[in-house]
């Protein structure tokens, strides 16, 4: 198999899914953000966004922190070092293929 094409088969399946790719790309550009900001930027509904975040958290790519601002609940999200490394590796493999 062509080495460039082999790189496609080796892409991180967790990140490669379009919804999760958008989430990871957005999170890579910031230190952290809250759930509502991410929902607004991705245009994903709450359930879909929560599902994608759970999968990313399971892979140790995203850290989810539940806090309160006064009495209002707030969910903060950030990429972990492993998540940043995985996204950078994904980007490098995509560059090699394209």
PLM ranges: what are they?
Residues 6-48, 69-71, 76-78:
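N-terminal helix-turn-helix DNA-binding core of bacterial DNA-binding proteins
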Residues 79-83:
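Accessory beta->alpha helical hairpin/"wing" motif in late/C-terminal subdomains of nucleic-acid enzymes
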Residues 1-8, 25-26, 84-98:
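Amphipathic alpha-helical dimerization/coiled-coil segments
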Residues 64:
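Short beta-strand "wing" residues that participate in macromolecule-binding interfaces
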Residues 55:
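Alpha-helical DNA-recognition elements
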Residues 60:
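Glycine-centered, phosphate/nucleic-acid-interacting loop/turn motifs that mediate DNA/RNA or nucleotide
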Residues 52:
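Residues within the DNA-recognition helix of helix-turn-helix
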């Amino acid at each position: 198999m062509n080495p460039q094409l082999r790189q496609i088969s080796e892409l991180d399946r967790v990140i490669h899914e379009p919804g999760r790719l958008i989430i990871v790309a957005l999170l890579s550009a910031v230190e952290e953000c809250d759930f509502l900001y991410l929902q607004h930027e991705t245009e994903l509904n709450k359930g879909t966004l929560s599902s994608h975040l759970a999968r990313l958290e399971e892979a140790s790519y995203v850290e989810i922190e539940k806090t309160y601002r006064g009495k209002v609940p707030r969910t903060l999200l950030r990429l972990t070092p492993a998540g940043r490394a995985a996204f950078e590796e994904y980007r490098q493999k995509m560059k090699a293929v394209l």
